[in-house]
Amino acid sequence: FPVPSIRKLYATKPLSYVANLLGHEGPGSLFTALKAKGWAENLSAGSGMVRDAEGTFEISIGLTPTGLDHIESIGEMVFDAIRQVRVHGIEAWRYAEQKQLAKMQFRFQEAVEPITLARALAARWHEYPLEDLLYAGYRYDELVKAQVIGYLSRMTPENLHLLLVAPGQETDQVDRWYGVRYRLTQLPEAWVAAWRAPSHVTALSLPVMNPFVPNDFSLRESLDTTLHPVRIVIEPGFDLWFDHDLEFGLPHSSLYFSIRSSQARGNAHQSVLTELYIALVNDTLSELTYPAFLAGVG
């Protein structure tokens, strides 16, 4: 969608607010609904091109072969998701949650090499005031509903540029620079009409409050001064080791589980089955673990 430039609104981030809701991958999300139908493998939403006067907002969906046959229905689901955000999703608590996550990311970000930081700051100097070079990308001052509504009003079928990249498509032009074959065409009027007044998709709902977002970052005092991991549980077939950080002082913990079985890697066939099982488990749990991922857990 062509939209006005977001560059001068970095302190309130209305487009990032919309992107976080449309690109959510938890229960009730657009991606979860598309995935349940077998139509999509991935989805992302956010700013695309950003210039001084104009920009784009992009929703990118990785389609399955089946999804390629249901573009009209997928578009209807996309515009119903946009409608839900416009009607029910502009709420102060949602903005406060995004603000808290951004503060966490800024406060507890890992150190980078000085040369890397210098290059990043030099690039930002063209976009942000000097005093905001470090914090601009994480700054969320307040929810300005008019700004959010203004950007959502640009997300209409009439303002949509739909790009389809897939094998076997008919083309009638060749790009002069790269030799890529393509075709330009108007969207079918039936699609535009359906997307203009999308049917309500019962599988879609806005994200609930994220239970993994912390507010207390205080560290527990510990008398443990051991410099090496200590085995604190010893049972048949099970050992538990603990290592207390004495250097960084961050509210982070890391859990590592190693489950070993002779049947998991006994031969090539078992190894392949194990990898497939791991992929299936991760895919099945992704809807439940996504809120934790947003909060930096994982």
Describe the residue ranges of each PLM region.
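Mature, solvent-exposed C-terminal subdomains and processed small-chain segments of exported/organellar
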Residues: 1-298
